[in-house]
């Protein structure tokens, strides 16, 4: 409970500070947490490193979420700067 409250406070601080500055970079856990906060209706995505995928000797195809692909959000918001409006377009 305390951890989730801390994460929510941090995300709110990030959102407020981003709104004043415009575009910024979101990478890794910050990107995932920000998308989870902005898009609560999105389903949880399970990691493909789990035991149920270990039996397959091939790479499973990338899942495409929403109108834009998951890799696109990394390209747009981690490698380059993006705004919260761009992040919201991935919901």
From Swiss-Prot:
Signal peptide start and end residues: 1-19
GO cellular component terms, A-Z: extracellular space
Entries under CDD domains matching the protein: IlGF_insulin_bombyxin_like (cd04366)
SMART domains xref list: IlGF
Prosegment residue ranges: 49-69
Cysteine pairs bridged by disulfides in the record: 27-78, 39-91, 77-82
PROSITE patterns cross-referenced by the UniProt entry: INSULIN
UniProt subcellular location: Secreted
A GO MF label: hormone activity
UniProt xrefs under InterPro entries: Bombyxin, Bombyxin_B, Insulin-like, Insulin-like_sf, Insulin_CS, Insulin_family
Keywords of this entry: Cleavage on pair of basic residues, Disulfide bond, Hormone, Secreted, Signal
Family: Belongs to the insulin family.
Record's function text: Brain peptide responsible for activation of prothoracic glands to produce ecdysone in insects.
Subunit structure and binding partners: Heterodimer of a B chain and an A chain linked by two disulfide bonds.
Protein name per UniProt: Bombyxin B-2 homolog
